[in-house]
Structure formats: structure tokens, C-alpha cells
From Swiss-Prot:
GO molecular function ontology, one term from the record: enzyme binding
GO cellular component, one term: chloroplast
Disulfide bonds: none
Organism per entry: Arabidopsis thaliana
The entry's keywords: Chlorophyll biosynthesis, Chloroplast, Membrane, Plastid, Transit peptide
Protein name per UniProt: Tetrapyrrole-binding protein, chloroplastic
InterPro entries: GUN4-like, GUN4-like_sf
Bilayer topology annotation: Peripheral membrane protein
């Protein structure tokens, strides 16, 4: 490059020196065969050299920008779920549940963030990657006992019957009455925030059903969880275990079962 700059500087002041430098320039770039041709470096040659240099610089710049953008995207993805992961790592399931609700609002879009809650119609706009990231953290840090995909399997096993689902994950409790009655647990004190052998599968995370079950239905039906093994698991008798045990304890028949459908917490 220094040879090229020197040649450009003396182009007008010393023709003979320029001719000599041109030959050296050709030799350095094209080898001894080009030297015997004694072709002077033309303006077109300069243009070609500059163009090649410019193209190389542009390619490097584009590559650098692409790498920067990719790094920024990765960093953003890595940090949006950090708080949730921290709570789960430390087994702070109550805080993790609250953070999950906050994340669900955040990933549902700006309108949901301004509103402070999610419309069930907005769930379909959530990217599968975001829901899977949340779900994977719950599964990883609960030994596979918590998470949306765990809840989905239970929901499908009870043929999408939400009353049976709520009994199965113990979001409902058996009332001490003459007939078998279930009512929603009081939030937050009556829910189970510790992971042990007594904690039912799919108990967390909670999904507010104050405005009905459509939000939960849309979450469990999201394509993010479509690859789950929907056909594996317990038999129908095992799925009815919660109801059957309650019936046996109360000593009444199925025709006397009463479910209270207050799905709020």
C-alpha cells in the first residue's frame, strides 16, 4: 500500500520515476511475467485496487454489525428470564409464580403491558420460544413437576375438563360438608409453595381464571407445547383418584358431588 501512495504522490512530478515505480508495482502484484510486459499502472488499475479495498472494508463492517446485532439479541434473550431463573434456582416458588405472570404480560405485547393483564386473544401472538423458555425453567428447577407443559398433559388426560383439572392439580380443595364439594383455594395462603413429595404435579405456575378459563386454555393450547407427549401418562382411574378419594372419605355417591366454579385468585 505504501508503494501505491508513493506512486500517487510522484505521478505528475517525475514521469520516469513514475514509470519505474509502476513496473515495481506490477511486479509485486502480478509477478515477474507482468514485468516483461512493462504495462504502466493505469487509472483503471487504481480504481480496481481501491474498489477491492473498499469492498473488503464494507464486508468487514457488515460482518461486525451483524455480529453486534446478534450479540445484542442473545443478550436480551438471556436477561429477560434471569429473574425467573434466579427465583427458581433458589426454590422461591411464590416469587417465581409472580414473575411468571409479569413475564406473560410482557411477552404478550405493549398493549398488555399498558393494561396490566393479558387478553386470551393475545396469547396466540406470543412466540413459542418465549413460552418454552419459561416452561423449561420451571421444569428444570422442579424436577419435572411444574410447568405449562406438565399442566397441558394433565389437562389433555382429563379430556380438557377444567373442573377435573383443577382438582387434579389441587387448585381446588375438598370442603368439609355432608356432600362432596370443591372450592378454589384462597390465594396465596392455601396454595403450595414448597416442592416436596406431597406437592401435586402441575400445581405451579398459577394462571388467574378470574375472567374465566379462556386464558389458561389458550396458554395450554399454544403451539409452543404441541410437541408434548399428549398420549402418555396415567389411566382414567388414576386421573379420577382425587375425586374418588374424596368420595370415599365423604361416603357419598357421584350424584352428590358439587363443584364451586369460582376460578379466581
Amino acid at each position: 500500500m505504501a508503494t501505491t501512495n508513493s506512486l500517487h504522490h510522484h505521478h505528475h512530478s517525475s514521469p520516469s520515476y513514475t514509470h519505474h515505480r509502476n513496473n515495481l508495482h506490477c511486479q509485486s502484484h502480478f509477478g515477474p511475467t507482468s514485468l516483461s510486459l512493462k504495462q504502466p499502472t493505469s487509472a483503471a488499475t487504481f480504481s480496481l485496487i481501491c474498489s477491492a479495498s473498499s469492498t473488503s472494508s464494507s464486508t468487514t463492517a457488515v460482518s461486525a454489525v451483524s455480529t453486534t446485532n446478534a450479540s445484542a439479541t442473545t443478550a436480551e434473550t438471556a436477561t429477560i428470564f434471569d429473574v425467573l431463573e434466579n427465583h427458581l434456582v433458589n426454590q422461591n416458588f411464590r416469587q417465581a409464580d409472580e414473575e411468571t405472570r409479569r413475564l406473560l404480560i410482557q411477552i404478550s405485547g405493549e398493549a398488555a403491558v399498558k393494561r396490566g393483564y393479558v387478553f386470551f386473544s393475545e396469547v396466540k401472538t406470543i412466540s413459542p420460544e418465549d413460552l418454552q423458555a419459561i416452561d423449561n425453567l420451571w421444569i428444570k428447577h422442579s424436577d419435572g413437576r411444574f410447568g405449562y407443559s406438565v399442566q397441558r398433559k394433565i389437562w389433555l388426560k382429563v379430556k380438557k375438563d377444567f373442573t377435573r383439572f383443577f382438582v387434579k392439580v389441587e387448585w381446588m380443595k375438598l370442603l368439609d360438608t355432608e356432600v362432596v364439594q370443591y372450592n378454589y383455594r384462597a390465594f396465596p395462603d392455601e396454595f403450595k409453595w414448597e416442592l416436596n413429595d406431597e406437592t401435586p404435579l402441575g400445581h405451579l405456575p398459577l394462571t388467574n381464571a378470574l375472567r374465566g378459563t379462556q386464558l389458561l386454555k389458550c396458554v395450554l393450547s399454544h403451539p409452543a407445547f404441541a410437541t408434548a407427549d399428549d398420549n402418555s401418562g396415567e389411566t382414567e382411574d388414576e386421573l379420577n383418584r382425587g375425586v374418588a378419594v374424596a368420595k370415599e372419605q365423604a361416603g357419598v355417591g357421584a350424584d352428590k358431588r358439587v363443584f364451586k366454579t369460582n376460578y379466581s385468585f
